[in-house]
């Protein structure tokens, strides 16, 4: 279990502010909205992790700050380069074909830099099959960043390595609601990364979740990177974010 202390801030930018989730269910101490280069930026502030070495955010004046940009693939070229470069994550959702998604995303890789002390390149680029999958990922990030206590301690290096796209290795992330209605298919078994999000109230059994996670993990190829987490909420569900490689 991980416990946060101090101040932390999540900044989510999007040209269309109606797509930005509020994350109010995670009870941020402050939520504000500002405009930067014509782009809406929502800021969620909450009280830095005691052991901050795993936080992949810039630290300014003692505040852990994590910057995320959400954009459609067709809008990438309209975003100023200075905005793209300062992000920790750029989330791109598909509006047409997978081939066009890959074409729009490729220029982002030339903006990436790797600091000597870091294992990944920034901004990390994540590609999604649709905007709903991207928003589900944002909710996952919001829970990890804004909730004061995490039941499952997740290393975000693992998340980036499993789901971020790289030059010549573009992954497209789709969403499935395993509980209550969908099932994994034979095609899903070939994904390269899977994030399983178990949600439920205080009655949710950790032992039961571990069993479910183990059973679902057997549905994937042994080489797949599988991450699972627990989010406390009123409704019980299991959501899967699945990353498959696009032909590039």
Regions from the PLM with identified roles:
Residues 1-248:
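Tubulin/FtsZ superfamily GTPase core signature
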């Amino acid at each position: 279990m991980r416990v946060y202390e101090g101040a932390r801030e999540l900044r989510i930018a999007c040209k269309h502010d109606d797509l930005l989730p509020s994350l109010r269910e995670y009870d941020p101490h402050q939520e504000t909205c500002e405009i930067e280069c014509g782009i809406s930026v929502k800021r969620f502030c909450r009280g830095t992790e005691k052991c901050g070495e795993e936080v992949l955010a810039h630290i300014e004046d003692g505040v852990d700050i994590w910057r995320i940009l959400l954009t459609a693939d067709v809008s990438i070229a309209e975003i100023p380069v200075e905005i793209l470069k300062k992000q920790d994550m750029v989330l791109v959702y598909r509006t047409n074909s997978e081939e066009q998604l890959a074409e729009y995303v490729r220029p982002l890789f030339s903006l990436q830099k790797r600091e000597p002390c870091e294992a990944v390149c920034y901004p990390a680029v994540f590609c999604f099959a649709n905007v709903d999958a991207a928003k589900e990922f944002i909710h996952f990030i919001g829970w990890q960043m804004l909730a004061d206590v995490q039941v499952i301690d997740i290393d975000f290096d693992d998340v980036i390595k499993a789901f971020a796209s790289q030059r010549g290795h573009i992954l497209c992330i789709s969403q499935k609601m395993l509980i209550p209605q969908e099932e994994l298919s034979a095609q899903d078994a070939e994904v390269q990364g899977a994030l399983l999000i178990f949600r439920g109230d205080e009655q949710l059994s950790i032992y039961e979740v571990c069993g479910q996670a183990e059973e679902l993990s057997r549905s994937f190829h042994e080489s797949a990177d599988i991450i699972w987490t627990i989010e406390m909420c009123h409704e019980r569900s299991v959501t899967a974010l699945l990353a498959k490689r696009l032909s590039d």
